[in-house]
Amino acid sequence: MISVIFALSVAQLFLGMADLLQRGVRVRFFLAHSLWVINLFLLTFLHWWSLWTFRELSWNFGMFFYGLIGPSLMFFACTMISPRNTTTNDVDLSDYFLRIRKWFLSIFAVLLVFFSFDGPLFGTEPLLNELRIVQLSIVAISIFGIFSTNRRFHTAASVGVLLILCIGVFIRFLPGQ
């Protein structure tokens, strides 16, 4: 079920982008928006892959329910990131992103908190490890973004999140980890 929700999340990202391109409207792209799409795509696969460590666990309903919360929030964030059913001939992704940023970044911060605690709650990793710095950094950037309407900040923040996610990949998935 968790994998299905992640697959639907990725499908939402693809559908959102394809919808913009197929409709024949003039799209004004915004680097921060494009990078957030990439960040969501990357985080979806990273978290899905990290769930491999739970394969030997004896699951109960509470664990399963908790395990569904993060992917469900991810699906919601992936659905929200791209405009749907626009009635105008012009789509400005900068304006759109700034309009949804409070909800989007709030959901993103909360889903990262849920992702941060599944390993410690399920007993597969300690509460404090190198990944918490990565996760807390992204949560902090998201919280700052909720309150900022500065386009440059959001571009820098989306680049920062991408770089931090890449650092997290090296921490989490290096051989021997």
Give residue ranges: language-model regions:
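A generic, lipid-embedded transmembrane alpha helix
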Residues: 31-54
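Juxtamembrane boundary at the C-terminal end of a transmembrane helix
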Residues: 167-177
